[in-house]
Curated annotation (Swiss-Prot):
The protein's name: Succinylglutamate desuccinylase
Entries under Pfam families matching the protein: AstE_AspA_cat, AstE_AspA_hybrid
Keywords (A to Z) from UniProt: Arginine metabolism, Hydrolase, Metal-binding, Zinc
EC number(s) stated in the UniProt entry for this protein: 3.5.1.96
HAMAP family associated with the record: Arg_catab_AstE (MF_00767)
Lineage: Bacteria, Pseudomonadati, Pseudomonadota, Gammaproteobacteria, Enterobacterales
Length: 322
């Protein structure tokens, strides 16, 4: 299985759907779904996903290189792994999504959207995770969901962690730092993301890794993510990662800006970078007689997008943690 990405993009089912490789067994579970199981018993399970948004190609190319290393035998596998390419049709078309944003649909929220390829895919991915986690007895469960941002950022690489009732494990946060993440953003409320679903329903330690900016296939400079690729390789092979890194800055979400109608106006231009700071009292957005302003001494914007569909998030405002 050395052509997983090509088969997924072409919508082709391989003639052989399972087999053995260097130290592990593999199974094709469907387009964009590949299960890897080490020959030796392991108590660790990992979801490694990318392409939930079809225009975010750098992480997909990174996963393709990791799979090539595993199947060539140059990289050892020490986790049960489910590799997920989230939205194959959007990836093939080079667009963010075909109908609706899948990363708002998980946890059954797909039922509130008009039926589409994305709603069906969200349901399929939910069932795939349920099957994957229920078929093993993993003591450790991780989910790394790889993305790129629409906009540039003051932090080239950062992580977004879902709301979680239990404390985050220090080794997981340390690995995120070793993977080159410059900042970690902690959600304070539930959401429809893939990472929130895996965390809430299966107790996985989950993070969306935002790596650079969205570009078409073959236009990505993957060298800027070498530290992340090396950390992923070390993780898969069970090798300790370096501890000589600066701890990521930490932020928490303090509010969400939502577009409700065509009267919505977001007062940030197209050049506003993620993590741009705004002082207390700054007018951020207006919609009719509703005004959104900064309420803390300093807040930082994340994912500003004035053209989202009505009812969706047009941005998050963050507060820096000590």
């Amino acid at each position: 299985m050395d052509n997983f990405l090509a088969l997924t993009l072409s919508g082709t089912t391989p003639r052989v759907t399972q087999g053995k490789s260097a130290g592990f067994r593999w199974r094709w579970l469907g387009h964009g779904l590949l299960e890897l199981t080490p020959d030796a018993p392991v108590d660790r399970a990992l979801i490694l996903s990318a392409g939930i948004h079809g225009n975010e190609t750098a992480p997909v190319e990174m996963l393709d290189k990791l799979l090539s290393a595993l199947f060539s035998g140059s990289l050892t596998l020490t986790w049960r792994v489910l590799v997920v390419l989230g939205n194959p049709q959007a990836l093939a078309a080079g667009i963010r999504y075909c109908h609706s944003d899948m990363n708002r649909m998980f946890g059954g929220r797909w039922q509130s959207f008009a039926e589409s390829d994305e709603t069906r895919r969200a349901r399929e991915l939910e069932l795939s995770l349920e099957t994957f986690f229920s078929s093993g007895h993993a003591r450790v469960r991780w989910h790394l969901d790889l993305h790129t941002a629409i906009r540039g950022s003051h932090h080239l690489r950062f992580g977004v962690l879902p709301q979680r009732d239990r404390p985050w494990e220090t080794d997981f946060l340390a690995w995120l730092g070793a993977a080159g993440l410059e900042a970690l953003v902690f959600h304070q409320a539930p959401g429809g993301t893939f990472t929130h679903f895996s965390s809430e329903h299966f107790g996985a330690l989950s993070c969306a890794l935002e790596l650079g900016k969205a570009l078409p296939f073959r236009q990505n400079d993957l060298t800027q993510f070498n530290v992340t690729s090396q950390a992923l390789s070390a993780l898969l092979s069970g090798v300790e990662t370096s501890t000589s890194f600066s701890p990521p800055l930490r932020y928490r979400v303090v509010s969400q800006i939502t577009r409700h109608s065509d009267k919505f106006a977001l007062y940030m231009d197209a050049q506003t970078l993620n993590f741009t700071a705004f002082a207390k009292g700054t007018l951020l957005a207006e919609e009719g007689d509703k005004r959104v302003t900064v309420t803390h001494d300093v807040e930082y914007v994340l994912f500003p997008n004035p053209s989202v569909a009505c009812g969706l998030r047009a941005g998050l405002m963050l507060e820096r943690l000590p």
